[in-house]
Amino acid sequence: MKSEAKDGEEESLQTAFKKLRVDASGSIASLSVGEGASVRASVRAAVEDAKPKSACASKDSWHGSTRKSSRGAVRTQRRRRSKSPVLHPPKFIHCSTIASSSSQLKHKSQTDSPDGSSGLGISTPKEFNAGECSSSLDTNHTGAVAEPLRTSVPRLPSESKEEDSSDAPQVSQASLQANDLSDFQSVSKLNLGKPCVCIGKECQCKRWHDMEVYSFSGLQNVPPLAPERRSTLEDYSQSLHTRTLSGSPRSCSEQARVYVDDVTIEDLSGYMEYYLYIPKKMSHMAEMMYT
């Protein structure tokens, strides 16, 4: 069966080549309609083989017919069929307000130490937004932060120790200039050389106090309770107090309930709605699952 099929293919190819040889220009157009699609396909394959590879790269010129060029190449994005919103994960990037002052300071330090940025080969962008994120302050960088970074660059053993000693006053100058830096990494790098003055007691350093750190402060920032709720809670605590004064020993649950702060489920749900985006509408598939 396979050999017969091969013979048939060879015969059709041979007939196609013969017809090509007879009249290369017009024979393809004058093929009889009754010969069917198989001969036509074989003719097309033969033409493709006969042409050099560079010429047959574009299929538009086959049969001399003009084909719409690059039909499926530029394809627009199909619209999402589901109605559910696209949920992106929350980005915990803390943008500090002090970033504008530190960018001004950065320009000053860049003019003071011209070799700091060039020694590292770090690009120094000229303009900064006022609300630029403080997390990017230590990555982009220049001057004041580039100086302490320079000391951590691995040096070749051939370089002399005098260079290291000459770098030390530069670092101290940079730390003097960088009083207002607000991101954690640069401040900690500046404090690598000299230890903090207030060791063993509470830290008084202005730089550490001014630093803005991303912190989850629990439920302290929840707006205060409505007055009617507050009055009911006060009544409840007073009734608990009178009940304990009457002499009956308090149960563990009552003792625990006394110290519970004024946080209820409603507060928690409001807090969740404020910090998390929970879509109100179910997706169609979820509705179908629930019905």
UniProtKB/Swiss-Prot annotation:
Pfam family, one: DUF776
Record region (Disordered): 48-174
Domain of life: Eukaryota
Residues where Phosphothreonine is found: 142, 232
Keyword Phosphoprotein assigned: yes
Entries under InterPro entries matching the protein: DUF776 (IPR008494)
GO biological process: one example: cellular response to hydrogen peroxide
Keyword Phosphoprotein tagged: yes
Biased composition (Basic residues): 65-83
Polar residues composition-biased segments: 132-142
Keywords: Phosphoprotein
PANTHER family noted in UniProt: OXIDATIVE STRESS-RESPONSE SERINE-RICH PROTEIN 1, OXIDATIVE STRESS-RESPONSIVE SERINE-RICH PROTEIN 1
Identification of the protein by name: Oxidative stress-responsive serine-rich protein 1
Top-level taxonomy: Eukaryota, Metazoa, Chordata, Craniata, Vertebrata
